Amino acid sequence: MEVGRVKRVAGPVVQAVGLKASMYDLVLVGEEGLMSEVIGISGDKHIIQVYEDTSGIKPGEPVKETGGPLVAQLGPGILTQIYDGVQRPLPLLAEKSGDFISRGLFVDGVDHKKKWEFKPLVKKGDTVKPGQPIGEVQEQLLIKHKIMVPPKHKGGVVKEIYSGNFTVEETVCVLEDGSELTMLQKWPVRQARPVVRKLPPTIPLRTGQRVIDGFFPLAKGGTAAIPGGFGTGKTVMQQTLSKWSDVDIVIYVGCGERGNEMADLLHEFPELVDPRTNRPLLERSIVYANTSNMPVAAREASIYTGMTTAEYYRDMGYDVLMTADSTSRWAEAMRELASRLEEMPGEEGYPAYLAARLADFYERAGRAEVLAGGEGSVAVVGAVSPPGGDFTEPVTQNTLRIVKVFWALDSRLTQRRHFPSINWLDSYSLYEKDLESWYAENVAPDWNQLKRRAMAILQENAELEEIVMLVGSDALPEDQQLTLEVARMIINFWLAQSAFHPVDTFCPYKKQYDLLKAILTYRDYAFDALRRGVAVDQIKSVPSKDALAKLRMVEDYEPDLKKVMDQMKAEFEALK
């Protein structure tokens, strides 16, 4: 391999001469061998972004080629791991260099010494094709890790297949052409893994959050953005999705966010229990912790490495959720690198290729028919942190052009202590039509109708609130006063949800439906009483309304709900 020399250093960007490396090849910069990537070539000059701190690098230091691009190591043992942005396990880095990561450390993303029990799924003489599972490993109690023929391998006839305990580098299968297959795959992180075909998003991704599942659903294999200003609850929202979504694997990429938040996450995850399996949540999770004080170039690597890992598990036929917190920090890293490279700035100083890079990332999501046969999906939820909560800035606008679900976090709701602070008037989901038939079949036939009724009440409430601010609610006609009351019940009893309450943090579909139906039944009783000449104050003060508010905090709510609805019916019949 060629050895070049450093010519110029500008922050995380290094210019080198004397190399023959290609675009996006991995190179090692300086005497310490800092992990870096070629991002530009001009004549005999190579522009390199360095994934580690460049302090102390000087012109004339060596730059060594590695002969290939940045790759993710994929194999048994990556679940439960906590990595930095370039897939180095943080616990191993801490063992080698203490709590502060030293430069130039190389650690494998997958443990090469640990032995795994390999169970073959094919036999001698079988023909295997790219992407086909040849065996499996019980990686966690509930996750079977399928060992697949690499997608770029041509496949062939099995000559030998072994069974027993092996490390990831030991041969587990030999084909007729002499090629040997191991449990370890390496895949360039910037390159999407192939599938047979993409499938339409017709299955919802259950989150247990009423405002999302009810009004703005995300499909399995879907894309969503959570833009919000400082303190609106983006990180808590993403952590809640990571905890409760009905997916098999969760990949959480902390991209340029606060170190304290990542520390909280790493303390919480091992203690949390997955409600579907009653196992620790970390058993189905992979965390990429790339905090704001780490080198900016590694933010891009963490996003792509996380996505490659997600695609790998999708290829096994699993449903995967990848959350990126926050894509704005990645965009800021792009802006810093672009300015160091003296590129022509676009809007607000971001590079002209900002939209292309974001699209490149989000388009790797989707539900697909995988090479092995069967289906898998990767859903992506990206947080966006617009400065000052301004949704017109370039990162938010370019993200909205690509994603199909927009959960707009509103600082006014945050100030009212309403969480999740998703604004029900600004947000939208383009998957609603695709998912209507699923909800009608699996939740209730009138679910979509109830949802539309509730949204119409909230929209009318927004119009009435402007009048109330001017003249007060008492000046409104009685029917509009009732509409305000029902809207307040929907907002406070149904849309608001506590992420820290053991019961309310997760709400199943049936409970969502029953609670919303109960509120709309109150509305029907109320308007019926109004037509009979009952005063509004009497209607508002029925005791069963307060009992209804408490049901969202009750786990076995159905007996109580029946009592409350019977009580409500009796109270309204007694009103004169």
UniProtKB/Swiss-Prot annotation:
PROSITE patterns: ATPASE_ALPHA_BETA
Keywords assigned by UniProt, alphabetized: ATP synthesis, ATP-binding, Cell membrane, Hydrogen ion transport, Ion transport, Membrane, Nucleotide-binding, Translocase, Transport
Chain's role: Component of the A-type ATP synthase that produces ATP from ADP in the presence of a proton gradient across the membrane. The A chain is the catalytic subunit.
InterPro entries: ATP-synt_VA_C, ATP-synth_a_Xtn, ATP_synth_asu-like_sf, ATPase_a/bsu_AS, ATPase_F1/V1/A1_a/bsu_N, ATPase_F1/V1/A1_a/bsu_N_sf, ATPase_F1/V1/A1_a/bsu_nucl-bd, ATPase_F1/V1_b/a_C
UniProt-recorded name of the protein: A-type ATP synthase subunit A
GO cellular component, one term: plasma membrane
Catalytic activity, EC: 7.1.2.2
Residue runs in coiled coils: none
Name of the gene encoding the protein in the UniProt record: atpA
Source organism, top-level taxon: Archaea
